[in-house]
Amino acid sequence: MRLLVGLGNPGAKYQGNRHNIGFMVLDEMARRHGFSPWRRRFQGETADGSIGGERVTLLKPLTYMNDSGRAVQDAASFFKLGLPDITVVHDEIELPAAKLRVKVGGGIAGHNGLRSISAHVGNDYRRVRIGVGHPGAKELVHGHVLNDFAKSERPWVEAMIEAIVEHAGLLVDGRDSTFQNKVHLALQAKGFLDNNDGSAA
């Protein structure tokens, strides 16, 4: 069994924020893969289903970003899951817009959602890091992640979500590098990434 966590803040005013791309991915994942309706539990919302023959629970913490770890800990404890069974999808300012990286463990790059999860369950869970770009100065980061994606960004955001959802079976199967490559190829094919460095076109 796998626990797939999408990070974000609850409420309509945060719905389109860069910080909420984890929620966006899970919403589309549940829709496309025919998961159960969302229900409230583990201090969040969950949907149950399967991807590639593997049982998967999707979790959107409703604790607000800074306390995401409480919901993850509750779910992991209930299902008796270890860190290798947990994958967290989140925005990443240290990556250019439209770039994706998968890694296990490592630093949190100032992400408060990851900080909370690491404090509650440990650090060695898988992260799907979705680049949203850096605003250029530290004092601008808060406003950057809590603002909606610009209209000009929406096409790549939609393409990114579609590619992640389409190739989710590879992620669930632990084939991280293949998953990462498939997502980047999908974005390149639509003209959103430069072929050389993977930055947004």
Swiss-Prot record:
What superkingdom does the record give? Bacteria
| Pfam families membership | Pept_tRNA_hydro (PF01195)
Q: Which InterPro entries match?
A: Pept_tRNA_hydro, Pept_tRNA_hydro_CS, Pept_tRNA_hydro_sf
* Catalytic site positions: H19 (proton acceptor)
Instruction: Answer whether the UniProt record assigns the keyword Electron transport to this protein.
Output: no
Q: Which UniProt keywords apply?
A: Cytoplasm, Hydrolase, RNA-binding, tRNA-binding
Main localization of the protein? cytoplasm
Instruction: State the reactions this protein catalyses.
Output: an N-acyl-L-alpha-aminoacyl-tRNA + H2O = an N-acyl-L-amino acid + a tRNA + H(+)
Per the UniProt record, which EC number(s) apply here? 3.1.1.29
Q: Where is this site: Stabilizes the basic form of H active site to accept a proton?
A: D91
Q: Where is this site: Discriminates between blocked and unblocked aminoacyl-tRNA?
A: N9
What's a single GO BP term from this record?
protein quality control for misfolded or incompletely synthesized proteins
Instruction: Supply the enzyme class, top level.
Output: hydrolase
A GO cellular-component term linked to this record:
cytoplasm
The residues listed in the UniProt record as binding tRNA, with positions renumbered to this chain, are Y14, Y64, N66, N112
GO molecular function, one example? tRNA binding
Its annotated compartments are: Cytoplasm
Record flagged with keyword tRNA-binding? yes
HAMAP family in the cross-refs: Pept_tRNA_hydro_bact
The entry's function note states: Hydrolyzes ribosome-free peptidyl-tRNAs (with 1 or more amino acids incorporated), which drop off the ribosome during protein synthesis, or as a result of ribosome stalling.
Quaternary structure and interacting proteins, as annotated: Monomer.
The text of the family note is: Belongs to the PTH family.
The name on file for this protein is Peptidyl-tRNA hydrolase
Q: Which organism is it from?
A: Rhodopseudomonas palustris (strain BisB18)
Gene encoding the protein = pth
